[in-house]
Amino acid sequence: GVSSHQIESIDRGFSFLKEDAPLDMRMGQAEQAVTAGDIVNLASKKELYEIFTKLGEESHARAISDAIVRARRIKALMTTGELAGIIEKEYHLGKNVPDFITAKDDKRVFQALRIAVNNELENLKEAMPKAIELLALGGRLVVISFHSLEERIVKLAFLDFKKRGMGEIITKKPLIPGLAELKVNRRAKSAKLRAFEKNI
């Protein structure tokens, strides 16, 4: 998954708070060809809508997709600041939307693009069974998810492992960060930890 180091690296383009960053978002810049900029500038309105809806769970996906398509007809969107500006200025123009609401829209759109660029959900689905196979007897598979779609994949995988008699789910409910953790690491706010112990 994405790391804090990658988020803080301005040349990676993961954060809408880094205004001059290129729209990249590739975790493996050497291996991957398609960037977030490619998706934003080349995907159809319908494709953008589906990405923002399915991967970002963005309720304003249609309006934001419309705004992006209108803007790129005039000029290709090259930076994170330009994309955030479309969301903030074009979509919210004249609607007196509070900054914290705008920031949530930014976050969901950027998150959806990052997931799409890196094929994160499919990679997680493929990694879960491979990880459990590599574990020794008594080994534990511990997964921290930051997104509801990721968490669902982990939950269903663990239930499948248990059904197949491979072991036991240690965390009946996901563990979430406490106040002490959140004070020093705000990015842990949406984190959920699940663990499975292999017994065969």
Regions of interest found by a model, annotated:
Residues 1-200:
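S-adenosyl-L-methionine-dependent methyltransferase catalytic core, i.e., the SAM/SAH-binding region
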